[in-house]
Amino acid sequence: MLEIITVRKVFLIGFLILILNWVWRAVNWVWLRPKRLEKYLKKQGFSGNSYRILMGDMRESNQMDQVAHSLPLPLDADFLPRMMPFLHHTVLKHGKKCFTWYGPYPNVIVMDPETLREIMSKHELFPKPKIGSHNHVFLSGLLNHEGPKWSKHRSILNPAFRIDNLKSILPAFNSSCKEMLEEWERLASAKGTMELDSWTHCHDLTRNMLARASFGDSYKDGIKIFEIQQEQIDLGLLAIRAVYIPGSKFLPTKFNRRLRETERDMRAMFKAMIETKEEEIKRGRGTDKNSDLLFSMLASNTKTIKEQGPDSGLSLDDLIDDCKAFYLAGQNVTSSLFVWTLVALSQHQDWQNKARDEISQAFGNNEPDFEGLSHLKVVTMILHEVLRLYSPAYFTCRITKQEVKLERFSLPEGVVVTIPMLLVHHDSDLWGDDVKEFKPERFANGVAGATKGRLSFLPFSSGPRTCIGQNFSMLQAKLFLAMVLQRFSVELSPSYTHAPFPAATTFPQHGAHLIIRKL
C-alpha cells in the first residue's frame, strides 16, 4: 500500500513539475521575454510602443490596414501610408531607429544603408525567421535554407541562371509575349484602341512565360501547377494577417485542410514532371535542347552527384521545394514589375516615347534579340525607377540567432529585423526631395550613380543572398516592354483607380485599367 502511495506521489510531483514548467514557459513567452527584449532595445536607443500582452501592435496595425486599404488614392499621392500604414506611421512617430511588435515578437526596423550592408553581408548571423504557422507557403527551397544547405542549393541552381542559359530561354519568353500581343491586336482590331485590365494580362503573361521557360514542352502542366500554388499563396496571406498561435496549423480546420490538399496536389504534379525529365537525362537528351530551367537544374544536380557523390546532390523533395520557391518569386515579382511599368509610362508619355525611340533604333520592326536587349539604356533606367518606386518586394525579415554586435548598436538573440525596402526607396534623405517623382534619369549612370555608393536600392535584396533570378526577371521585363511598345501606345483609362496593395508583392488592388492604341 505504501509503495502505491509513493508511486502516486512521485507521479503527482512529476505532473506538477510539468505543469509549472509549461506555465513558466507560457509566462516567459507572452510577458517576461518581450519585456526583457524591450528594455534591451530601448537601452540601444530604439523607440517604439510599449509591449501589450500577446497582441503587441497587431490590433492597431490591422485596424490601420483596414482603413488604408479601403480608400483609393489620387495619382500624385504618397502611397506609403496605404501600402505599409503601421510601419510608415511608426517611423514618423518614433524615427528611423524604431521597433514594432508582431504579437510577442519585437521587430527592429532598419533603414540605415551602412547597417543594411552589415546585415546583408553577414547573412549567416541573420537567418530568415520561422515565426508563423504557414511559413512553408512563402519560404521553401532556396528561399528558406541557411548555412551549408543554402550554399549547396545555390551552387547547384546557379548554372540554370547563367547568361548563356538565359539566351536559350529567350524564345520561350518571346512566344508567350507574342500570344498576348496577338490577342490585344484582335481585341483592338475594330477601332484600333481598347480598354483592358493590364494587371490580369500581365499576371497571365508572366505565368505563361515562367511555365514555358521552366518546363519547356510541358508548360501546360506547369501552368496548372502554378494555378494551384497561387491558391496556396492566397491562403497563406490570410494566415499571415491572423494572430500566430503555436500549433494552429495542425488544427483540423477547413482552411488547413485546403492548404494540405494544395500542397499534396502540387507536389504530386512536380514529382511527375521531374521524374519525366530525369528519364530524358538518363536517355542522353542532347544539350542543344537544353532550353528549360527544370532540365538545366536537373542536369546540374546529376552532374554534381556523379562528380561528388550522392550526398552532394538534391533530393526529389529538395527539387520540388526549389521549384516552388522559383515560381513564388518569379511569377509575383515580374508581374508586379510589368504592370507598374505600364502604369508609370501611361502617366509619363515623354518617357514612353523615349523608350519607344530607343527600341525602334535597336530593333526596328524585328523581334528583339538578347544582345540588343542588353544594350537598352533608357529602358533599363525606366525599369530601375519602377523597381524603386513600386518595389515588388516591399519588405523582408531576418532574425538574430545570437546576440549580434553591429557598428552602431547591438541586438539580442531572437529579435526580428525588418528591412522595409519600399520605405528605404522612398527615403528623401537617401534619394533627395524629388524622391516621390518618377525620374528615370536618376539612373543615367547606373545603380551606383543613383545611390552614390550607398545600399539604398534593394529590389532584389543584396549581398550573397541577392535574388538568383534577378537577370531572369530583368530580361523578361525588357523583352515585354520592347514588344509592347513596338506595337502599342498605352495611357491611363478614366476608370483607372490608383490603389497599390501589399500582397505577396506590390500589386494594384483594383486592377490597372489602361487604354491601348495600335501604332
Swiss-Prot record:
CDD domains assigned to the protein according to its UniProt record, in alphabetical order: CYP72
Organism superkingdom: Eukaryota
Record carries keyword Membrane: yes
Topology class, membrane: Single-pass membrane protein
Residues where heme binds: 467
GO CC terms in record: membrane
Gene3D superfamilies, sorted: Cytochrome P450 (1.10.630.10)
InterPro entries: Cyt_P450 (IPR001128), Cyt_P450_CS (IPR017972), Cyt_P450_E_grp-I (IPR002401), Cyt_P450_sf (IPR036396), Cytochrome_P450_Monooxygen (IPR050665)
Enzyme class: oxidoreductase
Upregulating conditions: By brassinolide (BL), auxin and dark treatment.
Tissue note: Expressed in hypocotyls, roots, cotyledons, stamens and silique junctions.
Keywords, ordered alphabetically: Growth regulation, Heme, Iron, Membrane, Metal-binding, Monooxygenase, Oxidoreductase, Transmembrane, Transmembrane helix
MF terms (GO), sorted A to Z: heme binding; iron ion binding; monooxygenase activity; oxidoreductase activity, acting on paired donors, with incorporation or reduction of molecular oxygen
Disruption phenotype: No visible phenotype under normal growth condition, but increased length of dark-grown hypocotyls, reduced responsiveness of hypocotyls to light and increased responsiveness to brassinolide (BL).
E.C. code: 1.14.-.-
Cofactor requirements of the protein: heme
Record localization: Membrane
Note: The gain-of-function mutant shk1-D (T-DNA tagging) shows a severe dwarf phenotype and an important reduction of the levels of the BRs castasterone (CS), 6-deoxocastasterone (6-deoxoCS) and 6-deoxotyphasterol (6-deoxoTY). The gain-of-function mutant chi2 show reduced length of hypocotyls grown in red, far-red and blue lights or darkeness. The gain of function mutant dlf1-D shows severe dwarf phenotype with low fertility.
Homology family: Belongs to the cytochrome P450 family.
Name under which the protein is recorded: Cytochrome P450 72C1
Organism the protein comes from: Arabidopsis thaliana (Mouse-ear cress)
